[in-house]
Amino acid sequence: MRRRKRLIIAAAVLLPLVLFGGYTALWLYAAHRVREGLPQWAAAMRTQHLDLSWQGVRVAGYPLAFRLEFTKIAVCDRDPRFAADVLAPMLTAGARPWHPFVWHLDLPAGLTATPAGGVPGSAVVSAPAATGTVAIVDADARLWLAVHEPHVAAGAVPLAARLVYVWLILPARPPSGPDEPALGVALDVHDLILPQVPPPFHNPVEEASLGVTVMGPIPPGPPRQAAAAWRDAGGTLEVDHVALRWGDLSLTANGTLALDADLQPIGAFSGGVGGYGELMKALAASGWIGKRKADLATTALSFFAKTGPDGRKRIATSFSIQDGEMFLGPIKIGPMPHIDWD
């Protein structure tokens, strides 16, 4: 009886130790494989035109996580369609052993993104801190980032915001036709500071969001050639949502964009606009349309407006781009900015 009791006590003590020791050995083995596999991962990324490098890396997180701690990490996209360099002094990527396809990111010292080659006058994006998540869902790669206090320096046109959320979806395989997605991107910008604001608006823009899906294969090559080939293959840009809150102005829309024979955008959207009077005043103040035309447009739009639950008038309308002109419903509101592909 005593011997049996001692065996039970010994088993109760030894079993957790054996399990803990086995888990420790498994964690150390997995950590070693992760560290040793990093160069192979970087080599695999080069086949996708991505150069990944770092000055130092450490595997930590025992016992309940795997955590990769990088110093001076750089990701350089060598694809001429998207060429850009992203640099970060520190990056921590952590995952739970039971969720190996979900990694949480932390960039406590921020990041800097520039077009590849550092062309003078090109846009430079910087932020003092960012967090995010990378996950594999149904074989698709998904990235979510929260970028804190980003600043965009683009020549003499600086932009800043309090917070920007970024979503990126990369399908597991490239599209074989125009009905399959090549890329999904979404932005949600809070408290955007513009360099110039037409009256009656003022800084900041409370919220601006955009979600798009690029449909059809994006061929390699210089931007003009790639855009022409994408257009000729039936490529479109599905605008899943557009939303804006800026003072009394509120706007929501969704639709489809394509490129015309001159590689300029054409498209049609449906949505709603509140505060359209302020919008017309701003268009007139910025010189897009004359004051008389803005007043006539405001009067015409008021016939279609309905009072919402908040007591404000709102119109359900369409927005279209055709022959280089923009239309809000049947009313032409001005020229579409020209895209220079060279």
What are these regions (language model features)?
Residues 47-176, 242:
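N-terminal beta-strand/beta-hairpin edge segment
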Residues 2-39:
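N-terminal type II signal-anchor transmembrane helix
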Residues 66, 103, 141-143, 183, ...:
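Hydrophobic residues embedded in beta-strands of well-ordered beta-sheets
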Residues 38-50:
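Membrane-interface amphipathic/juxtamembrane segments adjacent to transmembrane helices
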